[in-house]
Amino acid sequence: MKILVLNAGSSTQKSCLYDLTGDTLPQAPPKPIWKGDIDWTIATDHGLLEIKANGVEKKLNLSADDHLKGMSQMLDSLVQGETKVIDDLSEIEIVGHRVVHGGLNYTQATLITQEVKQTIADLIPLAPTHNPAHLEGIETVEKLLGNVPQLAVFDTAFHSTLPLEVAAYPLPYEWLEKGLRRYGFHGISHQYCVHRAAELLGKPLNSLKLINCHLGNGCSLAAVKDGISINTTMGFTPLEGLMMGSRSGSIDPEIPIFLIRDHGFTPEDVITVLNKKSGLKGVSGVSSDLRAIQKAIQEGNEKAQLAFKMYIHRLRFYIGAMLASLGGLDALIFTAGVGENSSEVREQACEAFGFLGLKLDQAKNESRPVDEDIATPDSKVRVLVIHTEEDWAIAKECWHQLTQK
């Protein structure tokens, strides 16, 4: 079974092709047979297409203003040249899409119809940088691959189990009735990681209390009890919660009003600042990339040092909040770009929770662990580093969709 997975961002398109054989899914995530990534931000006048297949890596510049042509060139590499892995695009049986916001409409993976597309469009105000890109990806596949089934896998679906007292804001009740509530995000990653954690721990998921720390450019935590999300840090939009690469996370809600009322900012100005010019990037003045922040710290940059200290403070603060929701903790999980690769962030985060009996094995923490427990044998809380596999999680949903027919 050939399954194409598309993960569209505001300025990127990441894709991969899985070839699944047999009547059951493999225990461990398989490697895709082909990967294609487009970055539209590489330069002002062109994008960059990178293809990896058959041990070959190819790069190609793309016209910056023609996303359809770029996608077409990417898919052509599946059937042409050194990166050819299939004879014809018709071999692709289903296409799975990560969709950031499904609101309350969709609590599980859903075959894409005109109605589903309209809902994704209606939710653009709640996910303005992501949902338009998802729609573009869906419609591009329609143009290039015809009537192949397409499946939407929603980042919000995993958090549809949030108790109402967690999901609701302390605002007029009629606003809640109109959908102004906390939805949560990174659900595909959170769900994958807690299932993988149960496998690594050798325990049933429905017996565990877990905190999953998805720390990338976007960051969120999820408190998961018995396999169910009971709290998370992102809310109505992916802006709430932790300090992130270029996003502010939670701030005093009066600040945007103050800027608009007294300093001539437009709502669009404020949205841009909070999403793209805040977080690590805004405080440090250096970058949204933690590696650049740490390099600047070594060079004596005090603003970079402040940014890192704020990042850790807020990470600890919200881990504490998730802990309170759970009433205990079996394992603390780190995943995504920062969570998987920054031993310093893991060490600093865990340091605050020694009172739980959590003990980090320093050697394991610094050994670039993957799907590994990095706590000491006598630690009362396990600490896991898990490589998130969002693409594989989406591919599994596609497999289930086709095999359940």
From Swiss-Prot:
Source species, domain of life: Bacteria
Keyword Transferase: yes
A single GO BP: acetate metabolic process
Cofactor dependency: Mg(2+); Mn(2+)
Keyword Transferase belongs to the record: yes
Subcellular location(s) per record: Cytoplasm
Cofactor comment: Mg(2+). Can also accept Mn(2+).
GO molecular function: acetate kinase activity; ATP binding; magnesium ion binding
Residues that, per the record, bind Mg(2+): N7, E390
Binding residues annotated for substrate, in chain numbering: R98
Annotated positions binding ATP: K14, H214, L215, G216, N217, G218, D289, L290, R291, G337, V338, G339, E340, N341
Annotated InterPro entries: Ac/propionate_kinase, Aliphatic_acid_kin_short-chain, Aliphatic_acid_kinase_CS, ATPase_NBD
Catalysed reaction equations from the record: acetate + ATP = acetyl phosphate + ADP
Name listed for the protein in its UniProt record: Acetate kinase
Upper lineage: Bacteria, Bacillati, Cyanobacteriota, Cyanophyceae, Oscillatoriophycideae
Gene name as annotated: ackA
